[in-house]
Amino acid sequence: MRYRAVVEYDGTAFIGWQRQKGVAGRSVQESIEDAIYRLSQQCVTVFAAGRTDAGVHALGQVVHFDLNTSLQDYVIKNALNHYLRSDMVSILSLEEAAEGFHARFSAKKRHYMYKIVNRDAPPCLDRLRMWHVPKQLNVSDMQEAASHMVGEKKDFASFRAKECQSKSSVRTVDRIDCVREGNNIFVHVSAKSFLHKQVRIIVGTLVQCGHGAFPPSYVLEILERKNRAAAGITAPPHGLYLVLVEY
């Protein structure tokens, strides 16, 4: 039987979603697979909609796995949460998946949120869940810059990590919204799929634009140059959240 689950996790202590050979540390995938084994004594592979990097969090990661069991869905969910209680991972919902469902390849859209605290004083309670930017940011300039990246089939070669393995750097970004709420700024980014570190490079570029390093229109030149060196910095991972996956 194939199961589909929505997962929340704090990415601080993890090396990322995916198991990685030769890399010290624990992945979210490994934690969930170990919990399933403790429940069922079955070795399964858990697939995710988004392979988040080390330090990146999830509010609505979607996963699937195949498991032979007669247990009811709620029993599986509660048992996994019992085994995951010390790992900062929580199964929010779990159900039998439709035939052919794949957490990654069936996804129609992924929604990310990046959280910035924009004030002089660094955060204390949420320091590993937001990016502290002390220099005042102009959100209107950030939004104008973002507008140049939204639309059909733009080449984001300047906005992907050097180690990105995707064959094409062309992506359609459906939404980038920059919203200020007091000292907090939220950057919402939505697309069917993203390049490696694309969202974090977009956010880093918008932040540099927001404190006046370059005008919003410079984003057009960044896109045209198709060179990672042309874009801004890569925002740190701890401000990024995978919020929702649509199917």
UniProtKB/Swiss-Prot annotation:
It holds the Pfam family PseudoU_synth_1. It catalyses: uridine(38/39/40) in tRNA = pseudouridine(38/39/40) in tRNA. The active site is at D53. It comes from the Bacteria. PANTHER family: PSEUDOURIDYLATE SYNTHASE, TRNA PSEUDOURIDINE SYNTHASE-LIKE 1. NCBIfam families: hisT_truA. This is tRNA pseudouridine synthase A. The lineage of its organism: Bacteria, Pseudomonadati, Pseudomonadota, Alphaproteobacteria, Rickettsiales. The gene is truA.
